[in-house]
């Protein structure tokens, strides 16, 4: 049985997927999350300035990681690397 992902892992996945721009459906399926989870996390990431919502035409909307989001992703990756190393030490 797989363990549940932490919030930080989900956020990291979303930021990785949105690095080059992605729509809601692509983010949702690639990050393996429900629509309600997507809405919750996407709303938070947009409001905090980690992801921008870009309207490229009607009805096309793309979500792209900001510079601040890229900085957060690097920090998340560092933290996850350290935690993975420590969890493998047992």
Identify the meaning behind each predicted range:
Residues 33-47:
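Short amphipathic alpha-helical interaction segments
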Residues 75-90:
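Amphipathic alpha-helical dimerization/coiled-coil segments
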Residues 18-23:
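Short capping segments at the starts of secondary-structure elements
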Residues 26-31:
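A short acidic, leucine-rich amphipathic alpha-helix
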Residues 58-76:
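Basic, amphipathic "hinge/linker" alpha-helix immediately C-terminal to the N-terminal HTH DNA-binding motif
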Residues 1-12:
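Short alpha-helical segments that sit at the start of domains
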Residues 48-57:
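Beta-hairpin "wing" of winged helix-turn-helix
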């Amino acid at each position: 049985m797989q363990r549940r992902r932490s919030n930080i892992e989900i956020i990291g996945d979303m930021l990785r997927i949105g690095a080059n721009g992605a729509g809601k459906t692509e983010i949702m399926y690639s990050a393996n999350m429900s629509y309600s989870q997507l809405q919750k996390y996407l709303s938070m990431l947009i409001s905090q300035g980690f992801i921008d919502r870009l309207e490229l035409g009607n009805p096309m909307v793309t979500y792209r990681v900001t510079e601040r989001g890229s900085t957060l992703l690097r920090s998340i990756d560092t933290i996850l690397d350290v935690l993975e190393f420590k969890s493998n030490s047992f």
